[in-house]
Each structure stands twice: as C-alpha cells, then as structure tokens.
Amino acid sequence: MYAGHAALATLAKGARPRVPIGLLVPVAFAPDWIQWVFDAMGRGNREISHSLVSVAMGATLVALLYLLATRQRVDAAAVWLTYASHWPADYITGLKPTWPGGPTVGLHLYTRPFLEFCVEAIVIIVCWFVYRRSLPVAARHRTVGLLIPIGLIAMQIAFLAATNPSFRN
C-alpha cells in the first residue's frame, strides 16, 4: 500500500484532531522509511522494518514518546494504531514477514493492479470521510477539501504506473 498509508493517517487525525497530521503521516510510513534506510546502507532486511515484531516495537516506541511529550493516553494510542496499521495495510497489497524466521504472508494484490487500485481508493475515500467529519461544518463542503482524496488517488495511480507496467496498459 502506498497512498493508503497517508489516508490512514488522515483517519487517525479525524478520530483524534489534537494529534498533528505532520506526525501521523511519517508514523504511518515509518516501516517503509526504515526499509529504505537499511536498503541504502546495503543491509536490506524486511524483517527489521516490516515484521509484526518490528512494527509492534516501532509503534510502541513512538506511542511512548508521544505519551511522554503530551500525557495524552488516547492520542498516544492513536499514534500507536497509526504505526501498527502499516502491517495490515501492507498485508492486503503485498507479502509481509511475520517474525524473524517466520512465514511471509499477504494477499499480494500488487499482482492484480486494478483490484489493488480499487481497494486502495476505497481506503482513501473512507478515511477521508472520517477526517472530513472532524472539520468545522463550514470547512467540510469546501471544494479544496476534495484535493486530499483526489491527490492521494493520483499518487496511487502514479505509484502503480511506475511499479507495474501492466497497469499502464
């Protein structure tokens, strides 16, 4: 999942408006960024970034840091869930490690790009509706608000086109 991670951050923002979106988006993408850093160092290992164990540890770390900084338990739980949402979201679209030495599992919808796009678009739209409900009434119906789901869906199309030649055909 690509744009869906950002959408899940907007879902968390909609549920917990006090938590900054500028924190939630990086938290939602954290396993990918950890993977890219290790890949750049020539030490790529998806168990370090994407296993259930590493996702649980990363989610716990960022949630504890947020709790220490804010003393807001429910908001810290939202931060934890945002990080942890990465694994089930990626389970839908790809293949993910469970634990070191454990099986790799997933629905691997990347092999079916149109279906993957449809699932991701649904995630984006549902998350946007939750986020939109958190806005002041006057702001909910502004056209500019549509830029969030449109932009995320456009990002997903670009991602699929760049990574899957059959999607372009």
Regions found by a protein language model. Give the residues of each.
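N-terminal membrane-targeting hydrophobic helices
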Residues: 1-169
